[in-house]
C-alpha cells in the first residue's frame, strides 16, 4: 500500500507545493491497481484535511494554500442564509493560527455554490481582534451531502424537495420524470437493522413502492401516485450555483413523516449512516462457520469449566463481554474479563472488515439498532451466548485488596458462558431478593465477590483522581404502536457499576501492555480541558460559591471591531472580552468539586457544566492519557462487536500473542502500572528504564498495522462515533418533541440549565425534556442579559432568572419542523437556586 508520507514528501518538493494526479502517477511510476489506490488515497487525504483539492485533479499541501490566505474548513449554514466555517487546524500557518482562534463568518452572497457541511476553501478577508474572521468561499473541496432527505412538494414549475435539515437552506428541484425511483436499493432489512427479518434479494421497485423497516416487521410495498407531503431521499445531480437551486432525483420514498418508524429512516439518511451491507460482506458472514475446529480449541486456553457469565441490559442481543471473579489462595482477587474474539472471523481487508471500518460503530435507536456487523456475527457467532462454546480474548488480572494490579495474563481463550444475566437480575441477587438468590444460587457467592471487587476498584480510581459524573439519563417507554408512552429516570445499580469497573480495568491493562511493548495500536485519549472553558466554568461556579481551585487565572483582554464600531461617538466604554491563557488543571480538582456538591440542590447543574467544560474523548495512535479517568494509558478493548477501534486493538494483541513464545503475557514483562505518574500530576515521571513510556508521535513501532494507517483509522472512528452520537441524540429529541405535542397548555416543574442573550433553557424535572423561554416573552418587565453571571435580570423589578434555578413553566408551543419546544414562565417571583452565592 502506498504510504501517505511518500505522497506528502513528493508534493512538498514541488515549486508551489501542489501536484496533479497524472503528475503523481508519472513521477511515482504507478500502474494499474496502484493508480486506483492513489486516487482513493488522495480522496481520503482531502477528506481528512491532509491535502487540499485546489483544481481539477490537483492537490496541494494545506500550508501552500495558507500562504495565499486560503484555508480549508467545514461550512455550517444558518437558516437565514449566512454561514460559518470552522477552520481545519492543518490548513493554518503558525502566524494565522495565532491570530485566528474562532470561526469565519461567510455572508450569504459569498457562500457561492457550497452547501451546509461541505469541506470548503475560504479566502480570509479580515481577522478580528477576538480571533474571529470574515471571508468568502472560493469553492467546495468535498461535498457533505450527496443525498438529502426531505419533504416532497409540487410547485408551479414542477416538483421540489424541502430538506428536513433546516441548515440545508435551498430547496432541491426535481425535474419531470425524476420523481419516482425505478430500482430499489438492497432493502434496509438486509440483516442490517436489528429486529428485522433478513431479506437479501435485489428487486425492481414498482412505481412509488417502498420497503422499510417497521420495528420487528417489514412493511409491504406501498403504492404512491401522489408524492405531496411524503418523505423522500434525493440524490443531488446538479450542485447549486449563486443563481440556481440544486437539482436531484428521488431514490427512495420513505412514507409519511408521522408514520411509525419513518423518523428512524429519516435520521439514518440525514446523517448518512451506512445501512446496506454489500453483497460480498453478507456472503462472507453467511459462509462463516459457527463450528470451532478442534485444533483451534486445543491451542487456546480453556476456561469452559468456570462459571463465567454475561451481564447486560434486558434488550441486549450482542454480548461482547463475560466476567468471572474468584479468591486466590493468597487472598487476592482474580478478575477474568473475556471478550468476543471478533478478529478471528473478521480478517483485515475482507468485505466485512471494509464495511465495519466504514460504519465505525453500531448505532442504537430506542426501538432498533444499525449494527456494525451483520446479525450472523453480531448476535450469533461472535456473541457470547449462554451454554455455547465461543472464542475469546481473555484478560486475567490478579488484584490485591486495594485494587492494585499484581499480575496479569492476556491470552486467546475459549469459554462457555453458564448464564445470560441482566443488570436487574444481578442487582436483585445483591439486594437480597429471595427469589433471585434461589434461582441463581450457584452464582450468589460469585456475584458477591464481584460486588466487593468493584467497590475496591472504584475506591482505587477515586484515590488517583478519576472523575465520576453520575448524571441521570432518560429511559423512554413505547406502546404497541411505537409511540412514546413515558420518559423516566434511568436507574444505575451496583450491577452496572461492577461491569463498568471490570471493563475499565481490562481496557487499562491491555493499553499498558501494548504500550510497554512499543507496539503500534489505538488509544482512547481524553485531553485536558481548554483554558477558556475552565475560565467560563469558574465564572459560573463562583456565582454558586464554588471553584475548581485553579487559583487566579491569567487573562488578557481584547476588543472586537464590532464593539468598537458600536461604541464610536457614544461616549461609552468599549466592551472588552477576557480571554484566559494556559491554566494548570488536574482531574482531582474536578473530583473534589463533585464531592463538594454531592447531594446539594446545585449538583445537577454544576455537574452538567463541568461535563461541558471537558473535551470530547477520541481515538489516537498516540497515547496522550485519559484526563477524566486520570489514567496514563487507556484503550477500547471490550466491545469489538460494536466498535471498530476495539477490533483493531484485538488484531494488534493477537499478533503480539502469536509472536511470543507462549500465548500469554506475564507480568514480568511490565512493571506495576501504578509506577507511571499521571501526566497531570506535579510529580516527575519515572525514567524509561523503570516504566512503560509512551512512544513519541510517529515513532517507528512494531505490530501488524503501520502508524499512518492507525492515524487514519483513529480519525475515521472518532468521526463515526460523533456521527452516531449526534444521530442518536437528534432522534431522541424528536421523539421527546412528539411526546410533548399533546401536552401544550400543561405546566411542569423545571430547572434552568442554560441562560443566553435570547432567553433561557429549562429542563423539565421529571421528563428530561428541554425547551426555551424566549426573552421577548417576559413581558412584565424589561429584562437584560448579564454575561458574566449568566443571569437575566428585570430592570425595574430586579427579578432574576439564573442557572440552576427551579421554576414552574407551561408548555406554550411546539415547532414540529424545527423540533423545538417553547415554554412560558408561570411563577410570579423567581427565587434563586438554593446554595446561590453560598461561601465554601
Q: Residues of each region from the PLM?
A:
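Short, acidic/hydrophobic/Gly-rich beta-strand patch recurrent on exposed beta strands
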Residues: 84-88, 105, 160-165, 761-766, ...
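Acidic, glycine/serine/threonine-rich low-complexity segments
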Residues: 208, 695-696
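Electropositive polyanion-binding surfaces
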Residues: 200, 228, 233, 238-240, ...
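Short Cys/His-rich micro-motifs in 6-15 aa windows
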Residues: 829-831
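Charge-lined substrate channels and their catalytic hotspots, especially those that engage the 3′ end
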Residues: 1-336, 343-388, 425-428, 738, ...
Amino acid at each position: 500500500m502506498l504510504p501517505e508520507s511518500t505522497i506528502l514528501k513528493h508534493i512538498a518538493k514541488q515549486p508551489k507545493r501542489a501536484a496533479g494526479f497524472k503528475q503523481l502517477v508519472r513521477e511515482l511510476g504507478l500502474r494499474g491497481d496502484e493508480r486506483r489506490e492513489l486516487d482513493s488515497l488522495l480522496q481520503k487525504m482531502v477528506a481528512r484535511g491532509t491535502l487540499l483539492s485546489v483544481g481539477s485533479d490537483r492537490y496541494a499541501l494545506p500550508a501552500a494554500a495558507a500562504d495565499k490566505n486560503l484555508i480549508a474548513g467545514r461550512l455550517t449554514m444558518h437558516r437565514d442564509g449566512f454561514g460559518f466555517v470552522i477552520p481545519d487546524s492543518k490548513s493554518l500557518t503558525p502566524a494565522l493560527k495565532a491570530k485566528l482562534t474562532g470561526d469565519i463568518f461567510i455572508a450569504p452572497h459569498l457562500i457561492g455554490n457550497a452547501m451546509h457541511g461541505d469541506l470548503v476553501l475560504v479566502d480570509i478577508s479580515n481577522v478580528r481582534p477576538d480571533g474571529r474572521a470574515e471571508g468568502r468561499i472560493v469553492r467546495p473541496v468535498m461535498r457533505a451531502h450527496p443525498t438529502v432527505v426531505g419533504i416532497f412538494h409540487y410547485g408551479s414549475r414542477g416538483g421540489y424537495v424541502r430538506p428536513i435539515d433546516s441548515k440545508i437552506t435551498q430547496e432541491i428541484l426535481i425535474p419531470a420524470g425524476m420523481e419516482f425511483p425505478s430500482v430499489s436499493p438492497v432493502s434496509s432489512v438486509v440483516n442490517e437493522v436489528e429486529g428485522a427479518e433478513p431479506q437479501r434479494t435485489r428487486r425492481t421497485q414498482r412505481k412509488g413502492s417502498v420497503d422499510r423497516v417497521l420495528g420487528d416487521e417489514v412493511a409491504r410495498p406501498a403504492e404512491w401516485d401522489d408524492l405531496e407531503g411524503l418523505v423522500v431521499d434525493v440524490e443531488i445531480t446538479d450542485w447549486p450555483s449563486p443563481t440556481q437551486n440544486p437539482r436531484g432525483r428521488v431514490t427512495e420514498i420513505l412514507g409519511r413523516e408521522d408514520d411509525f418508524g419513518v423518523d428512524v429512516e429519516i435520521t439514518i439518511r440525514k446523517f448518512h449512516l451506512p445501512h446496506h451491507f454489500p453483497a460480498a460482506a453478507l456472503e462472507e458472514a453467511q459462509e462463516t462457520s459457527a463450528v470451532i475446529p478442534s485444533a483451534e480449541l486445543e491451542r487456546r486456553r480453556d476456561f469452559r469449566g468456570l462459571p463465567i457469565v454475561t451481564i447486560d441490559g434486558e434488550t441486549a442481543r450482542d454480548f461482547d463481554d463475560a466476567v468471572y471473579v474468584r479468591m486466590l489462595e493468597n487472598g487476592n482477587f482474580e478478575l477474568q474479563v473475556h471478550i468476543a474474539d471478533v478478529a478471528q472471523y473478521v480478517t483485515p481487508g475482507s468485505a466485512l472488515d471494509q464495511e465495519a471500518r466504514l460504519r465505525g460503530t453500531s448505532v442504537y435507536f430506542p426501538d432498533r439498532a444499525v449494527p456494525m456487523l451483520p446479525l450472523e456475527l453480531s448476535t450469533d457467532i461472535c456473541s457470547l451466548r449462554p451454554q455455547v462454546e465461543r472464542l475469546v480474548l481473555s484478560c486475567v488480572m490478579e488484584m490485591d485488596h486495594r485494587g492494585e494490579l499484581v499480575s496479569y495474563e492476556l491470552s486467546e481463550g475459549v469459554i462457555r458462558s453458564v448464564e445470560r444475566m441482566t443488570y436487574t437480575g444481578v442487582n436483585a441477587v445483591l439486594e437480597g431478593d429471595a427469589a433471585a438468590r434461589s434461582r441463581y444460587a450457584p452464582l450468589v457467592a460469585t456475584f458477591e465477590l464481584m460486588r466487593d471487587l468493584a467497590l475496591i476498584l472504584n475506591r482505587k480510581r477515586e484515590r488517583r483522581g478519576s472523575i465520576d459524573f453520575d448524571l441521570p439519563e432518560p429511559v423512554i417507554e413505547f406502546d404497541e404502536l411505537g409511540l412514546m408512552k413515558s420518559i423516566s429516570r434511568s436507574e444505575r445499580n451496583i450491577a452496572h457499576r461492577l461491569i463498568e469497573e471490570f471493563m475499565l480495568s481490562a481496557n487499562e491493562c491491555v493499553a499498558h501492555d501494548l504500550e510497554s511493548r512499543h507496539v503500534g495500536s489505538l488509544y482512547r485519549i481524553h485531553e485536558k480541558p481548554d483554558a477558556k472553558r475552565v475560565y467560563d466554568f469558574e465564572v459560573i461556579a463562583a456565582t454558586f460559591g464554588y471553584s475548581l481551585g485553579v487559583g487566579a487565572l491569567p487573562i488578557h483582554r481584547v476588543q472586537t471591531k464590532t464593539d468598537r464600531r458600536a461604541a464610536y461617538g457614544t461616549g461609552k466604554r468599549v466592551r472588552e472580552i477576557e480571554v484566559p491563557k494556559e491554566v494548570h488543571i488536574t482531574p482531582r480538582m474536578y473530583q473534589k468539586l463533585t464531592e463538594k456538591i454531592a447531594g446539594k440542590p446545585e449538583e445537577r447543574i454544576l455537574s452538567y457544566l463541568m461535563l461541558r467544560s471537558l473535551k470530547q474523548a477520541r481515538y489516537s495512535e498516540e497515547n496522550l492519557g485519559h484526563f477524566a479517568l486520570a489514567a496514563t494509558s487507556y484503550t477500547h478493548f471490550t466491545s469489538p462487536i460494536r466498535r471498530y477501534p476495539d477490533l483493531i486493538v484485538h488484531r494488534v494483541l493477537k499478533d503480539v500473542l502469536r509472536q511470543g513464545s507462549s500465548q500469554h503475557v506475564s507480568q514480568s514483562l511490565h512493571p506495576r502500572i501504578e509506577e507511571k505518574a499521571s501526566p497531570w500530576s506535579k510529580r516527575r515521571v519515572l525514567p524509561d528504564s523503570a516504566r512503560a513510556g509512551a512512544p513519541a508521535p510517529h515513532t517507528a513501532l512494531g505490530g501488524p498495522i503501520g502508524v499512518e494507517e492507525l492515524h487514519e483509522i483513529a480519525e475515521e472512528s472518532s468521526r463515526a462515533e460523533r456521527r452516531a452520537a449526534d444521530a442518536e441524540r437528534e432522534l431522541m429529541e424528536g421523539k421527546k418533541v412528539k411526546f410533548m405535542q399533546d401536552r401544550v397548555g400543561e405546566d411542569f416543574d423545571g430547572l434552568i440549565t442554560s441562560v443566553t442573550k435570547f432567553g433561557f433553557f429549562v429542563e423539565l424535572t421529571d421528563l428530561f425534556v428541554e425547551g426555551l423561554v424566549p426573552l421577548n416573552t417576559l413581558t412584565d418587565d424589561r429584562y437584560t442579559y448579564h454575561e458574566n453571571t449568566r443571569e437575566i435580570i428585570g430592570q425595574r423589578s430586579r427579578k432574576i432568572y439564573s442557572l440552576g434555578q427551579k421554576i414552574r413553566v407551561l408548555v406554550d408551543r411546539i415547532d414540529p419542523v424545527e423540533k423545538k419546544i417553547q415554554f412560558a414562565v408561570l411563577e410570579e417571583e423567581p427565587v434563586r437556586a438554593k446554595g446561590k452565592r453560598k461561601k465554601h
